Amino acid sequence: PLIQYAVEEAIDVGINEIVFITSSEKYSIKKHFDHNDDIQTQLLNTGKKDMIEKVNPSIFSGIKFHYINQVNQNGLGDAIFHAKDVIGEDPFAVLLPDDLFFSKKSCLSQLIEIYEEKKSTVLAVNQISKSNIHKYGVIKPEDINSAPIKVEDIVEKPSADEAPSDIAV
């Protein structure tokens, strides 16, 4: 699943505590990432030792997973707010595995470098077609020609006519 790539990217940059904000129906995420002793025992007992790494990959050893239920789906900001007790005052990354990007240097490592330099909130954005704008949060940039772009506002899933730009989060 795409979320696997997001988790592996986080682990690759040194993140060792991961919070999943899910609805109560999303048991599959917890089932996917939690160590499952029952399955491991069953695989050992049936001579399928080679399958254990696929079920409980060692990449997750030392990683702490938190699962927080968001009862009412009130947007991304509300989802992040639900993690406040786990995050505290520490810097954090929000990974949205809706899209997958391939690059020589991971998107998250680039964001962390910019954060460490600017000591400010950093967003990864991507230019999208007008026909897809209604699917994304879209930024209203202060100055589209600056680098990095300063964001004045984010409009959640606007129509193409209401979108302040064609740059999505």
Residue map of PLM features:
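Well-ordered alpha-helical segments embedded in enzymatic catalytic cores
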Residues: 2-6, 78-82, 153
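Acidic side chains
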Residues: 12, 34, 78, 98-99, ...
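Short loop/turn motifs at secondary-structure junctions
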Residues: 14-16, 88, 117, 150
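Short, acidic Gly/Pro/Ser/Thr-rich loop/turn segments
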Residues: 27, 102, 159-162
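Conserved beta-loop-beta/alpha segment of the NTase-like Rossmann-fold superfamily
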Residues: 39-42, 52-143
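Catalytic-core segments of class I nucleotidyltransferases/pyrophosphorylases
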Residues: 112-116, 143-169
